[in-house]
């Protein structure tokens, strides 16, 4: 199944019209903004988890590296720092040919659950009362599912 067909089928499963013609589609899943992106034979899902804590981010970076080891703390995804904005990102690939609408929905749901755990973890690394740059906002323009 190609990306556009998968996105249309996913929309059918959700009861909404989704368009993957531009090679990407954004969904808000349980408050987590998830981008589904065409990566050739692969489906890439990714999300911006926000800025690392300003004071001593080394502890968070250590936790990220340990979580990435054998994907034990990421549900098979990868945590990274974006070179463009310095934010923490979570990303995961899977083969398009292995997915149907039901499988894609499950894949995205599980990814969003993992992302939500990391969003909460990032908040725990911030000092009490600090307002970090919350990358997840209700005005993202993403379709809420």
Language-model features, listed with the residues they occupy:
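Short, internal acidic amphipathic alpha-helical interface segments
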Residues: 48-87, 93
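Short, highly charged C-terminal tails/helix-capping segments
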Residues: 122-145
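Short acidic/polar mixed-charge low-complexity motifs
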Residues: 30-33, 41, 86-87
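Ampiphathic alpha-helical segments that act as solvent-exposed interaction surfaces
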Residues: 63-64, 94-127
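A short acidic-to-branched-hydrophobic micro-motif
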Residues: 36-51
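Charge-rich, low-complexity N-terminal segments
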Residues: 1-34, 82
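Short small-residue beta-strand/loop micro-motif enriched in glycine and branched aliphatics
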Residues: 44-47, 89, 99
């Amino acid at each position: 199944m190609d990306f556009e067909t998968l996105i249309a089928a996913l929309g059918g499963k959700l009861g909404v019209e989704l368009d993957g013609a531009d090679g990407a589609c954004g969904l808000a899943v349980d408050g987590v903004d998830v981008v589904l992106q065409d990566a050739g034979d692969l489906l890439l899902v990714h999300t911006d988890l926000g800025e690392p804590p300003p004071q001593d981010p080394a502890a968070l970076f250590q936790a990220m590296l340990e979580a990435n080891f054998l994907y034990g703390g990421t549900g098979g995804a990868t945590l990274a720092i974006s070179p463009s904005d310095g934010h923490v990102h979570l990303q995961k690939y899977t083969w398009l040919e292995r997915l149907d609408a039901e499988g894609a929905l499950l894949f995205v749901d599980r990814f969003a659950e993992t992302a939500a755990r990391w969003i909460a973890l990032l908040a725990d690394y911030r000092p009490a009362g600090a307002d970090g740059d919350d990358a997840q906002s209700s005005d993202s323009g993403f379709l809420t599912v």
